[in-house]
Amino acid sequence: MLIDVELTIMRGERVGIVGPNGAGKTVLARLLAGDLAPTEGERWAGPSIRVDLLTQTAEELPLERTPIEIVRNARPLPESAAVALLVRFLFDVEQIRRPVATMSGGERTRLRCLLLMLTEANCLILDEPTNHLDIPAVEALEAALEGYDGTVIAVSHDRYFLDRIADRIVDVRDGDVTAYEGGFSAWERGRSGP
């Protein structure tokens, strides 16, 4: 449970959300996304904010469709452009023509991350985006986020990932939320004291 939380996130910020298991990180992400309503108080987002949320599971992917079909359905692209995007997210030519049902958890996460990049969202909220990803896939995600000019909010236990993508850390702990400037390493130094 989160109590008396006040948090402002500005356009273009890169925010990492950290804290112990069960502290409410996913709840905070869902509140920020508008996927969950607060029981008290309010969530306010500017009228031009368009949010997309990457959950810890990729259940929203149609299992019978192939990655190439899903990408081309998300945005009308020539097949060669869709293939190039999929390759950028480390899919090989065989994988892009197999149904999602045959894909691993990491492959589904990569596909969902790619789809986020194709949305009209100007705020991406990622809940444990590096789960199930190997190092090359995490690096591909980092590169895609570097090229994204909107706001990124990422719940993660991956210290290296947060150091690479976050310019502010929000610590969720004991029902409270505290913001720290800098990436994960700066947050860790600040918590441990001088």
Task: Describe the predicted segments one by one.
Residues 1-194:
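ABC ATP-binding cassette signature C-motif
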